[in-house]
Amino acid sequence: MLTLYGTRGSGSASTEAALEIAGVPYRTVDAASWQPSPGLDELRRVNPIAQIPTLVLDDGSILTESAAILIHLGLAHPESGLLASDPAARAQQIRGLVYIGANCYAGIGILDYPERWYPDPDDAVRKAMQARGRARLHELWQIFADQFPATPWLSGARLGALDILAATVSRWGGARSALAQSRPQFAALLGRIDVDPRVAPVWARHWPKP
């Protein structure tokens, strides 16, 4: 059985949703580097930088990076529809997954941990970095929305890995509210992904409504 390290409200939600869609049995270990968690020491043993999601496969090999995990699951379980069967369409989906990971996902780190890029920032520097980082994040999402139209999903005829990752990472940094103003059709698509019956139960565990 696969083992997924993650915590509620984190990027591990995308991996969890993909595993559910693919019908792959897995167990979860609650672990996060930014808060006390029962599985943190175990996570550090398999992933020294303690990033989540981290997925341990049946053979003991370790997968990190959300895009890489989703690509693997899509290739290993083609019947799931996580990735397209057509090579050209699949190539664009992989491009989109890597775009989100390299640009939008990475940009969250500047908002949450500006001190990683600027040692001991004072309050003014911190706020300036976060403001510029947020503006850049929103710009990157706008570019993504323009480059990856829904037909009717980002993954094509079926909801897939690219939809899942976009709906996860867009929850942070005020991206959704910004997209509702600048790219309302794309924001509406994210809302459709949220309520899809294959995704909604996972989202309810990660982002429970008050």
Residue ranges and their predicted role:
Residues 14, 39-42, 185, 189, ...:
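Hydrophobic alpha-helical segments typical of transmembrane helices
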Residues 96, 100-195:
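GST-like fold's C-terminal all-alpha helical module
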Residues 22, 47, 77, 148, ...:
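A broad structural signal for alpha-helix termini and local helix breaks/kinks
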Residues 74, 169-170, 203:
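Active-site-flanking alpha-helical
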Residues 200-210:
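Terminal-tail/helix-coil boundary detector
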Residues 68, 185, 198:
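Residue-level recognition of oxygen-bearing side chains
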Residues 1-127:
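GST-like domain detector, emphasizing the conserved glutathione-binding G-site
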Residues 53-56, 154, 200:
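Short beta-strand(s) of the beta-wing in winged-helix/HTH DNA-binding folds
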